[in-house]
Amino acid sequence: MKRLMVAAGCAMMAAVALAAPGARWTLERAQAWGKANPWYCGFNQIPANAINDVDIWQKGGFSPEVLRKEFKLASDLGFNCVRIFLQYKVYEDDPVWFLRAFERYLQLADEAKLKVMPVLFDDCKFGPATDPELGKQTEPLPGWGMWGWVPSPGHTMVADSRTHGRLEEYVKSVILHHKDDPRIFVWDLYNEPTFAMGRFSRHSLALVKKCFKWAREINPSQPLTVCRWNNDKGVNDIVLNESDIITFHCYQPADGTRKVLKDMVQLGRPVICTEWLYRPNGCDIPNILPIYKETGVGSMIWGLVNGKSQTHLPNGVYTPNFKGPWKHDLYRPDHTPYDVKDLEIIKKATGVK
């Protein structure tokens, strides 16, 4: 069966190769998409039982029951979307398994009326690992946020263009299977390119360009995007001029958020902030969510349920005596609220009675 599915996938890829590639959406098409879609308000998910995205997807780690319970929490808040990081390493090990797990994820999200934004690649690291490995993952390090997070596909593959043919197959296979899937509302091709890459940053940017090219060859009905996450002109000239809709990350207080938001809105395309919520920095729900609501800019906070990733702590910094406030997340591991007032503000924004 596995061989048959792989063979079928190869046949579909061959058909795609004969099709005319798509182009960046026109301004008119992007604006029409924005008018046809709701105000998106949701969250980034690392399930509480997972320390990283290998843990989320690999055999023995993928946990439908955990997902179902967390999606119920999100649905009860009125959230209508979720952003989830995929992991190339799991796909490479067994494409059939990965695609089935992803399909199950989409089913569960759909049951909770959540649209999905998959993230295909990611350069971020906050602990020692620069490349993902299968099997048992590292345990959380007390006092260190996202200690066990790993990039996808990993810095070694990003820097080695000889491996990019394998990455092309992954991108095209995943998108092809869901190119017209209404459960997916945006394809986020690459999270925070060049993050922690140092002298290898140019390789990240080269891969970003390839990702857009590969995805355009599939020509999905959903928009493509890569976020604006810092002030690096070299990065932003690529991502803001290639994306069909504009996405950005902002962990600043209200004044800084309004400034970045204004710059993004001026580009004339639909805009979604796909990462925010940094309570110690004043980027909190009482001050920031109303800004996104009043402007109609989409909002996706970082974190729903706190867990092994320890995203309540500062990332990449050892803080053994941390006393809060939490950086990210809305619920403790037992699903009790961190701050009931935050939940009330979210429900007001989403229209939940």
How would you label these PLM feature ranges?
Residues 348-353:
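Catalytic domains of carbohydrate-active enzymes that cleave complex glycans
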Residues 289-334:
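Aromatic/acidic polysaccharide-binding cleft in carbohydrate-active enzymes
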Residues 1-4:
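Positively charged n-region of N-terminal signal peptides that target proteins for export
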